Structure formats: structure tokens, C-alpha cells
Amino acid sequence: MEVLIPKRIQLSLILALTVTFCAGQVLADEIRIAVASNFAEAIKEIAERFEAKTGHEVILAYGSTGKHYAQIKNGAPFEAFFAADVERPKLLEDEGRALSGSRFTYAVGKLVLWSPKPDVVDANGSVLNTGDFRFIAIANPKLAPYGKAAKEILQARGVWDQLQKRIVRGENINQAFQFAHSGNAELGFVAFSKVKRPNRAVPGSFWQPPQSLYSAIDQQAVLLKSNATARAFMAFVQGEEACTIIQSYGYGTL
């Protein structure tokens, strides 16, 4: 009789075998991971846990999903790619630049309209329609899935066209956050993970748009090279410990 092993147990076994094998190695391995900017804080904590357990080093490169995709197509030496969408990992898989069957959803992103000042953004995001601000920051919709989602929300609220001269576009969602945080824009659409931090309140005011206003931000990862350490890291990301970390930064998990 065939015995089916739950996926999380399979992933734990992969990690355990890798740790056991690596204990006998003189030198630890080093892997390079391309990561969507919105996921920077969460994956840094996950990588630190993985390094402590395995002795391997995880080098993280942050940027917009579109920019990383272009770099990978041009031969950038990454072992894995954590995107902010489904499209780019799937394209890499279809193009033969990623390992078939390695793609999975590691997080579901959420977008918020945030201002570092209290009382600027109310529970309904009314400031979008009243226009009581000079500039609003978003990520570039052509490069960043969070920027595309921000555009969809502004279109749904009927203000996209009229706000064109007041929109400050960041290359990625972290840059959009910096524009708002520094005061170069009074408010901005940012990843919920920038507002919801484990054990720390982020000052300001925010509105969390209903999911019906923008396309789901399913964030997928994919292996680019058949590397044992990279496989172990991907398995670790899908385990319970990493999922708890991901959720603590305001993401959903499947």
C-alpha cells in the first residue's frame, strides 16, 4: 500500500537531510537569491534562521520584480527568484530559465494607503477623492506588481486620470514607501508589510483597500539552478517556522 507523506513533512525531511549532509562539509555553501523589494524584511529574518540551522550563507538582492526578471534573462547569477507576482516566475519556467515544477506561492501580498502623519488617511481612504495632498507615491505599475495594484485601486476610485501630475513613481514598492516616509509625498500606496511589523507599531494613518479593488498579489518563487542548498532554502521557506514569520509581516500564506 502506498503511504502518502504530507507536503510539510516532506519539506522538513529535505531540510533535515541537507543539514545532516552539510555537517560533514568543511565549507558552507553560498546561495544568491533575487527578492522583490516588498519582501525584504521578512526574507531577511527567514534567511537568518536558515543560516543558523545550516551554516550556509544566503546573499539577498532586493529590487523590483520586473528589473530582476530582466537581470535573470541577461544571465544574472541567482539560484532562486522570489517575485511579487506569478507572471515572471512562470515566464522564466516557460522560457527554460527556471526549473520546471519548482514554482510555488510563498506569500499573498496586501496593499495599503499610508501616511506617516496621523489623521491624513481615514478608514475609507477618503483623501483620494478630497485631494487634500500635493503628491502621492506608488511603485511603477510597469515594473512592480504592487504598483499595478495601486493603479487598479486609483482607477476603481475614479481618480487615476486626474492625479497623474501628482503621482510620484518609485522603481519598486520600497522606494514608494521612502517617498512617503521622507515627506516627498504626503501619502503613498505601500506594502502592508511596511506598516505591520512584528512587535512594533509603525506611526501614521492608513487605509486597507478591499481586495475587490485590485487583483490578488500572489507572490511566487522559483528555482533557477539545481542546487542542493537552494532547494533546502526553498523547502525551509515553505515550512511552518517560515510561514509564521511571513504571516507576522502581514502577508497571507496558502
Predicted regions and their residues:
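Active-site phosphate-binding/coordination module
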Residues: 101
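Exported/periplasmic ABC-transporter solute-binding proteins
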Residues: 27-55, 59-62, 66-76, 83-86, ...
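Bacterial N-terminal signal peptides
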Residues: 11-22
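Bacterial N-terminal signal peptides that target proteins for export
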Residues: 2-13
